């Protein structure tokens, strides 16, 4: 639908989601990674359904055909000093994936909602590097 009305460069696409949208972003990352080159999951609800997304990740061996970037962020307050954080656990399970660059941002003093804006800022920085 968007492609019908706007020019889309299919080699430069980013999927962004926050909270449950961040969980959706991780789902697409795991199951349809060829559709986007960049994935930004801000404060993803990894805990949902008894950490189902982590279980799904552990069952897969992911290697990427093209260079792919995954950006994960979480607010310090919402993380409740959990060590490692859910996003760090997610990233650790991907450490041996080929053609994948992972960035993690722990946002100091930020709650779940407050963590949204610094993550959006990263999307704009990512897009401006092109």
Predicted segments, located by residue:
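Residue in the alpha/beta-hydrolase core beta-strand immediately N-terminal to the catalytic nucleophile
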Residues: 14, 38-40
